Amino acid sequence: MFLRSSASRLLHGQIPCVLTRSVHSVAIVGAPFSRGQKKLGVEYGPAAIREAGLLKRLSRLGCHLKDFGDLSFTNVPQDDPYNNLVVYPRSVGLANQELAEVVSRAVSGGYSCVTMGGDHSLAIGTIIGHARHRPDLCVIWVDAHADINTPLTTVSGNIHGQPLSFLIKELQDKVPQLPGFSWIKPCLSPPNIVYIGLRDVEPPEHFILKNYDIQYFSMREIDRLGIQKVMEQTFDRLIGKRQRPIHLSFDIDAFDPKLAPATGTPVVGGLTYREGVYITEEIHNTGLLSALDLVEVNPHLATSEEEAKATARLAVDVIASSFGQTREGGHIVYDHLPTPSSPHESENEECVRI
């Protein structure tokens, strides 16, 4: 399609017609970290998402990008389990401390920060780093799992199933301090969190959700209410009439495994493509998205190259739809419409291709 730009000179002097974009300043942070759990391969998630075309997609949407690259986390050679169960606590603590500094820098610079994991233990660092400059933030946690076990209730010992327990102020009398975690300052309260997509919640986690009045929408609620009503209630709970930053923490296993097979803890009966993208489209429409985690893409767990690529492409769609990509196509936003050219300007006519 072509637009005649010469006509705009009649409306705006000699300034050519400009098709302005809805500009977001977006920081990209790769976090190739896997020690929040025991399966190899999730550290290759950032590379897979990059190879699936994330930066090009965001650029086409008009985003101004600052790429921090893929971080290199400090190795912790001696990292014994806590309580003979919780694995790699020092590695997780130090990696999140380093990640929090980068996210904090990005947010303080005016960027919406996209962090590509890596496992979901990284949300400790991204949320703390975000909260340093946006202390009134709220969290939308899209996941098959609640990730709110404590080190004393976990069965697996994996910290990627515990990150929120370290962040919620009201839980701190139930959470022991792990080695490497002394720097952590809890920054969330239950009214500031909403879960979407839950379908594998352990008994202690269910106890926490109920007794601390944390809002959640399981897949059963999504089936019953529909995703539109779920998002309306989410925004009513978190935002209401306030304008506050949103931190979206999105685990790719929120989707049904048929869509996202390359992940470490798949659970049947997950979000459809349409439901998942509707969530991010609606968050974008608020204009309040300030940080986004996309985690748990694990190319090594795919049974074929196509499965790995499909999961990474889905991750790109989640991120892109959070920054303006719609299922109608990514739109360039007009600041005005052109009018027919004057006869004497026709020979200088310029066309802009969209």
UniProtKB/Swiss-Prot annotation:
| Swiss-Prot/TrEMBL catalytic activity | L-arginine + H2O = urea + L-ornithine
The record's section on NCBIfam families has: rocF_arginase
Instruction: Give any Gene Ontology cellular component.
Output: mitochondrion
Pathway, according to UniProt? Nitrogen metabolism; urea cycle; L-ornithine and urea from L-arginine: step 1/1
Cofactor notes: Binds 2 manganese ions per subunit.
Q: Name one Pfam family in it.
A: Arginase
Q: What does this protein do?
A: May play a role in the regulation of extra-urea cycle arginine metabolism and also in down-regulation of nitric oxide synthesis. Extrahepatic arginase functions to regulate L-arginine bioavailability to nitric oxid synthase (NOS). Arginine metabolism is a critical regulator of innate and adaptive immune responses. Seems to be involved in negative regulation of the survival capacity of activated CD4(+) and CD8(+) T cells. May suppress inflammation-related signaling in asthmatic airway epithelium.
This one is known as Arginase-2, mitochondrial
Q: Where in the cell is it found?
A: Mitochondrion
Could you tell me which CDD domains the record lists for this protein? Arginase
Q: Which family does it belong to?
A: Belongs to the arginase family.
Which keywords label this protein? Answer: Adaptive immunity, Arginine metabolism, Hydrolase, Immunity, Innate immunity, Manganese, Metal-binding, Mitochondrion, Transit peptide, Urea cycle
Give an example GO biological process. positive regulation of cellular senescence
Which residues are listed for substrate binding in this entry? H145, A146, D147, I148, N149, S156, G157, N158, E202, T265, E296
Q: Which organism's genome codes for this protein?
A: Mus musculus (Mouse)
